């Protein structure tokens, strides 16, 4: 999948799940399941419920995403 195909949207982490998975409520009100990207995992960036994050969504499955940035 090319990098141009992803949809980037902001959201808020609502719940923490096992295996570095999170429930994220997007700006449009949808709740998706998201995992942590490799760069965030590599740099030991902690993500907690209530954090604002940027999520990448695939156009093929809009219910799952990847957290690529945590706002300060």
Curated annotation (Swiss-Prot):
Q: Which residues form the S1-like domain?
A: 1-72
Entries under CDD domains matching the protein: S1_IF1
The Gene Ontology CC terms held by the record are: cytosol
One matching Pfam family is eIF-1a
Compartments it resides in:
Cytoplasm
What GO MF terms are annotated?
A: ribosome binding; rRNA binding; translation initiation factor activity
Question: Could you name the domain of life of the organism this protein comes from?
Answer: Bacteria
User: Membrane-spanning regions, if any?
Assistant: none
Keyword Magnesium found: no
PROSITE patterns, per this entry? S1_IF1_TYPE (PS50832)
Record keywords, A-Z: Cytoplasm, Initiation factor, Protein biosynthesis, RNA-binding, rRNA-binding
Gene3D superfamilies assigned: Nucleic acid-binding proteins
Q: What interactions and quaternary structure are annotated?
A: Component of the 30S ribosomal translation pre-initiation complex which assembles on the 30S ribosome in the order IF-2 and IF-3, IF-1 and N-formylmethionyl-tRNA(fMet); mRNA recruitment can occur at any time during PIC assembly.
Q: Which HAMAP family match?
A: IF_1
Q: Which family does it belong to?
A: Belongs to the IF-1 family.
| Role of this protein | One of the essential components for the initiation of protein synthesis. Stabilizes the binding of IF-2 and IF-3 on the 30S subunit to which N-formylmethionyl-tRNA(fMet) subsequently binds. Helps modulate mRNA selection, yielding the 30S pre-initiation complex (PIC). Upon addition of the 50S ribosomal subunit IF-1, IF-2 and IF-3 are released leaving the mature 70S translation initiation complex.
Name the chain's protein.
Translation initiation factor IF-1
Which gene is this protein's source? infA
């Amino acid at each position: 999948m090319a990098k141009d195909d992803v949809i980037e949207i902001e959201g808020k982490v609502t719940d923490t799940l096992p295996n570095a998975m999170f429930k994220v409520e997007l700006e449009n009100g949808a709740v998706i399941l998201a995992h942590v990207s490799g760069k965030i995992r590599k740099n030991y960036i902690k993500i907690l419920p209530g954090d604002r994050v940027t999520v990448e969504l695939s156009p093929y499955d809009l219910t799952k995403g990847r957290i690529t940035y945590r706002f300060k």
